[in-house]
Amino acid sequence: MRFGVEFGASVPQAQRITDRANVQSYAARLSRVTWHPISVSGAKANFHVLFMGEDDRAQMLTRVQQIVPNINPASMQILRDIPQSIHCLVIAFSATGNSSDYRESIALIRAEHPELLRKSCIHEELAQGLGLANDSPRARPSIFNDDDEFSLLTTHDEMLLRILYDPRLRPGMSLRQAHPIIRQIAEELTGGRS
């Protein structure tokens, strides 16, 4: 996984330095958690992190079409009409014919928000773009639910990501195939506690 960090023209230089450093630090943490190579690199990025302000909307739409030339109209419509109440989002694009195998992701983080909110968006959207996309009210304590109780990646979230990236699991496995493996990994991570 290679994160590419890009900024809209309206984003001040000092903010760019802070946001890039937050993505770099978080990428290192995600790599440690998942035991998967994750880095920040402009070259050949497959996960694009766009910090764009409202004034950068046209630039953002153009850039998204460059990244994913065949983006479906529904995804473009979401980006074109994103309501101001949405602070950030991630859209993941799967390999052809395999919806469980992400090949490209784009996270959009509104640049005009305060630093802590942008950092929270980095944590949530980059983790979701790694494959834990569904928000669930049963995921607690977690950033993977919509109650906004937790803003930064929790130990529980780290365990979920570690399970997801365990080499014993493969993209496209059925729940029936994956369930006993997931249970075993969870027991290993928690020392057998349930």
What are these model-predicted stretches?
Residues 15-38:
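Zn2+-dependent metallopeptidase catalytic core
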Residues 13-14, 58-59, 116-120:
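Extracytoplasmic/secreted cell-surface and envelope-processing proteins
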Residues 120-133:
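Active-site recognition of the HExxH zinc-binding catalytic motif
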Residues 1-8, 38-60, 146-147:
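Acidic helix-start/capping segments at beta-turn-to-alpha-helix junctions
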Residues 1-2, 25, 33-35, 43-46, ...:
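Extracytoplasmic
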Residues 1-23:
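N-terminal Sec/ER secretory leader and immediately downstream segment
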Residues 61-66:
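A contiguous, low-structure linker/loop signature
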Residues 67-117, 133-194:
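Metalloprotease/metallohydrolase-associated module, dominated by Zn2+-dependent proteases
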